[in-house]
Regions:
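Primary mode marks residue(s) on the alpha4-beta5-alpha5 output face of response regulator receiver
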Residues: 1-169
Length: 169
């Protein structure tokens, strides 16, 4: 279990099975993004997430965070998954925003969801609509090394159902 404070990555609890979790945050006051990764996601995707969260915690602009991540991929410091990488955001206590930049709107607890990382994926590769808004399956960061198929699920980690008011942002 990891967290980031003042630019430092903190190990809150050591694991033994390759699965790891991170309490991510962005520039918004109150943003809370609990996210867990399978072993391949821990080896690859989580390092990108930690880099982004660390830079944001230092007040780095979102454009600069994006450039730093792209540069880290280009230098081989960050690597795309070689096999299925999975992340899941199942906590009903998540506080999400529509975008990590200052223009992002508070969404709150959006939907519990799984993210399957498929580098270079596009909605068309899965027969999905381009924007995916309101759909149970969508593609985030299409066409990039960070592309992910996002699949909404009906229950939170505690077993409670998604409230009818969950927002589709």
């Amino acid at each position: 279990m990891y967290a980031v404070r003042d630019g430092n990555v903190l190990t809150l609890r050591e694991g033994s099975n390759g699965v790891a979790c991170l309490v991510a945050r962005d520039l918004h006051e109150g943003g809370l993004y609990p996210i867990c990764f399978n072993a391949e996601g821990t080896r690859t995707v989580m390092h990108r997430e930690l880099m982004q969260v660390r830079l944001r915690s230092l007040g780095v602009s979102e454009d600069s965070v994006d450039r730093a991540v792209s540069s880290a991929y280009a230098r081989g410091e960050l690597t795309a998954p070689r096999e299925l990488a999975l992340a899941y955001m199942m906590s009903p206590r998540q506080v999400l925003f529509s975008s990590p930049d200052a223009a992002g709107r508070r969404v709150g607890a959006w939907h519990p969801h799984l993210m399957f990382y498929v580098p270079g994926a596009t909605p068309a590769k899965f027969g999905l609509t381009q924007d995916g808004a309101g759909e149970p399956i969508s593609v985030g960061s299409p066409g990039t090394p960070q592309a992910e198929m996002i699949v909404k699920v009906p229950k939170w980690a505690d077993g409670s159902p998604v409230a009818g008011g969950a927002k589709d942002q």
